[in-house]
Amino acid sequence: MALSKIDVANFLTGTIPQGNVANASLGAVTALPAAIATGKVLQVSNFVQASSAQTFSSTSYADLTNVTVNITPSATSSKILILSNIGSDLNDGEGYGMQFVRGSSSIYATKTLYTLYSEGVTQVYNVNMFNYYDSPNSTSQQTYKVQIRSYNNASINISTSYNSNIQVMEIAG
């Protein structure tokens, strides 16, 4: 059996014939990012934050005042990335749930309630980050907002030491 030695460093030089490459030529690969229009950030909304603290004491969802933002997608294939931070002041055994609402419909709700159970600590200020990737399939203006509900009807404070906020981005889809 004959053995061949291949010079790997100089194995391929020159130009590959066009018929051997499915994409016209290797030079066309640089055009690939332009050919794939998904994933680009097309627009970013204003950063909107709560202007004052708010207390929630019901297990039913209620709006987080002023934490609402509008965006008008440029294409029906666009996705909307929702970014939100919720600042809370929880006492031991208290907690909350949150949901994102588009128009009047819930599009995402936490599966579990964020609760504080800590031995020896009576009060904690914290910030939780919530993100969601939405597909409104529309070029009409979309309104997104945050709603909060209490755990076990406890009276919880939101946006006391940290102003809760929301921001959205249109992503090419």
Regions found by a protein language model. Name each.
Residues 1-53, 173:
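Glycine-rich, low-complexity segments
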Residues 47-48, 54-57, 61, 72-141, ...:
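Terminal beta-strand-rich extracellular "head" domains
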Residues 63-65:
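Short, solvent-exposed loop/turn segments enriched in Ser/Thr/Gly
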Residues 67-71:
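Extended, low-complexity regulatory regions
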